[in-house]
Structure formats: C-alpha cells, structure tokens
Amino acid sequence: VGTSAVDLGPRLAVALAALTVLAAAAGRLSGLGQDRPVAVAAVRATVQLAAVSAVLLVVVRSLVLSALFVLLMVGVAAVTAAGRATGLALRSAGAARRVGTAAVPVLVGAVPVVGLVLAGGTVPLRGEAVVPVAGILVGGAMTATSLAGRRLREELAVRRGEVEAALALGLVRRDAVHEVLRPAAATALVPPLDQTRTVGLVTLPGAFVGVLLGGGTPVQAGATQLLVLLGLLAAQVTAVWTTVELAARGRLLPDVPR
C-alpha cells in the first residue's frame, strides 16, 4: 500500500485557512460569539504544532530526550487539569499544590498503561513510538481528570447540603463524598465509552486514520486503534477513580465539607 500522507503544500494552507474561516463564521453567525476564540485557537494550534514538529525531529532520536518531553507533557496536562477541575486561576494562591495534586491522576492513569504496552513489546522502545503513545494517554488522563473534577465541583455546589447531612449522620468525609458526588464524576467516562462502543461504525479515530495515511494496511490500522482505545479507556477510568479519591479526601477541591 502506497503512502497517502497529506500533501504539504499551498493546497494544505488554503484548506486550513478555509476551515478556520468556516468555523469562525459559524461561531459568529450562530450567535455563540465564538468567532474570535476559534480564530485564536486555530492560530495557536498552527504555531504550537509547527514548533512541536520541529522539536520532535530532534527529540525522538533519543530515549532520554523523549522521556523529558513526555514529562513536559505531563506538566502541561497537570496545569490544565488543575485549572479545569478547581476553577481557580494559575496565579491564585496555592497553585503549586493544586497542580501537584492534579498531576497525580494524570500519572496514575497514564503510567501503568504506557508501562504495560512497552513491557509487553506491543509498542517498541523508541522515541518515535513512545512519544505519541504516551502523549495520547497523558492527554486522555488529563481530559478525564478535568471533566471529573469539574463535575465534582459543580455537583458539590448544588448538593453541598446532602454531603453535610451525610456527615451529620456520622459518615466520614470520604464516604459522604462517595455517596453523594461519585455518580457525577462517572459522566466523565461517557465520551471514551461512546467512542469505544461506536468505533468503526460511526467514527474512524485518529490512530486508525494516521496509520492508513502513513501507508499501513487496514488491519494494522485497526489493531493500532484498538490498542489506543483500550489503553485510553484504562487510563481514563483510573484517572477518574483517582480524582474522586483525591476530592473525597479534600486534596483536590478546596471547599469539601469536613
């Protein structure tokens, strides 16, 4: 099978510009007021991916540099998850503690899965393989942590009285939070579960398309996508579980009743 990689030329630039204009126009004409955020996001993504692509040309040649790059991704993921989960700005007091706490579910979700696929030889121990796989899993764990933390925070704001009532009945904080808030955190798993259930029927996700565009066979693409999907599911379920436990112990959200 020959390569079907995207052509890097003027036509790509025109297509990207047209897609950005389409998204921005829809954001404006719909009344959502998202035209500027869409344009900024598109420019930012272009700059970031260009920079990352240039860096990765060097990074993936060395396992040490690849590991350092993965650590950088974890750091960015922790900062993002901390902000989304707590709703507090990075510049506010206690930011370092919140970022450190948010890094825990990201690491607990991603590290075992990365270790498993590397130890089993499914993914070769080379930079060009480790970085993208680790990036996908870290990103998935980050999203799960952000969504679970945000849902816990929103649910706590609405059902705070129920948590306090459970505490008044003699439950310890961990059990009270589990009883009242844990079901809300489970909604963070709806996107990965839906994606896994409908893969091949409704969607052809990124890994599948990437392998095909890179010249792989449909069987190779399917096997790669299955590995990614199940790895993501494991990482995200573990990340949500860890997020709930941290919140129940008062380490993630600042105002959980005691």
Give names to the regions the model predicted:
Residues 23-36, 78-91:
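C-terminal ends of transmembrane helices
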Residues 33-60, 64-71:
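Loop-to-helix transition at the N-terminal end of transmembrane alpha-helices
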Residues 179-258:
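Transmembrane alpha-helix interface motif
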Residues 151-188:
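Short cytoplasmic-facing helical segments at TM-TM junctions of multi-pass membrane proteins
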Residues 50, 64-86, 95:
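Active-site cofactor/substrate anionic-group-binding motifs, chiefly glycine-
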Residues 11-16, 66-69, 86-90, 97-147:
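Loop-to-helix entry region at the N-terminal start of transmembrane alpha-helices
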